[in-house]
């Protein structure tokens, strides 16, 4: 029988980031749990708006093994209604004290593309990470995160790996020149890659992003590239999500951003066990 090369396991970049003066080791993959304080994010299971629901979701994310809670107050799904920065900030101002009280040790990431919101959530509410899904489109974002000194997640909207590497190289250089130390790269699955094909092409070569020598975050949870390919609904997309998260881990992901924390934590444990017990 002919040998089939399914691709070697690629270990994540050995990297630490500074969170609240503590070094967070990303050489062993971590899980980031999604909390959307919105009425219209694409997966209903992540939406919470009342005080009790926010508290319960925070407890659930941490209890299932996530180190990071990613809080979004503006839906980025393609057909969502636009939300102004003021309303986005009002939602976050309500939710963040509840989350911090419920889980004081959790690392809180803010999913926003507004520099003004990045500043306020860090300075007024003690947010730990800024997660920017618009690749620094706000001209004040890079200077703001560099001044704040918080880790920054830079998500690509490029359609292919070639353009992504060119853009990332330029953007990282700009951030470094401003003094930004901790940068995490997100290939941006579901953003500008097409519904299915472009996303799978990118996933197949994702390990090549390690040339940037920066940690990689993958947010692939329950996205259209799963349910459109399989002919199922978003609610039925957990199995596909777990498969893709496992592939992402084997291609060097440092952080998995997910709606369903426990399956992702289990995927991390299984891949890590395989690495630890691999034949030398």
Segments predicted by a language model, with ranges:
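N-terminal glycine-rich anion-binding loops that anchor highly charged ligand groups
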Residues: 26-37, 60-72
């Amino acid at each position: 029988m002919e040998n089939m090369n399914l691709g070697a396991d690629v270990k994540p970049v050995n990297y630490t980031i500074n969170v609240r003066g503590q070094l967070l080791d990303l050489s062993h993959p971590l899980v980031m749990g999604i909390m959307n304080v919105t009425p219209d994010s694409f997966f209903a299971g992540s939406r919470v708006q009342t005080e009790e629901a926010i508290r319960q979701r925070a407890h659930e994310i941490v209890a299932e093994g996530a180190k990071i809670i990613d809080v979004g107050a503006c839906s980025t799904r393609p057909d969502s209604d636009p939300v102004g920065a003021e309303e986005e900030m009002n939602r976050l101002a309500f939710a963040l004290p509840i989350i911090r009280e419920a889980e004081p040790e959790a690392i809180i990431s803010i999913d926003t593309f507004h520099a003004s919101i990045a500043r306020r959530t860090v300075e007024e509410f003690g947010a730990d990470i800024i997660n920017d899904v618009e690749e620094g489109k706000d001209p004040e974002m890079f200077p703001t995160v560099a001044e704040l000194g918080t880790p920054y997640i830079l998500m690509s909207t490029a359609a292919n790996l070639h353009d992504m590497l060119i853009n990332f190289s330029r953007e990282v250089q700009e951030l470094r020149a401003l003094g930004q130390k901790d940068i995490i790269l997100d290939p941006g699955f579901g953003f500008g890659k097409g519904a299915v094909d472009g996303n799978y092409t990118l996933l197949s070569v994702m390990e090549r992003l390690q040339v940037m020598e920066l940690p990689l975050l993958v947010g692939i949870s329950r996205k259209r590239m799963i349910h459109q390919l399989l002919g199922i609904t978003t609610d039925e997309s957990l199995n596909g999500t777990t498969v893709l998260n496992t592939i992402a881990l084997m291609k060097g992901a440092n952080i998995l951003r997910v709606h369903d924390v426990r399956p992702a934590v289990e995927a991390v444990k299984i891949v890590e066990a395989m690495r630890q017990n691999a034949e030398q």
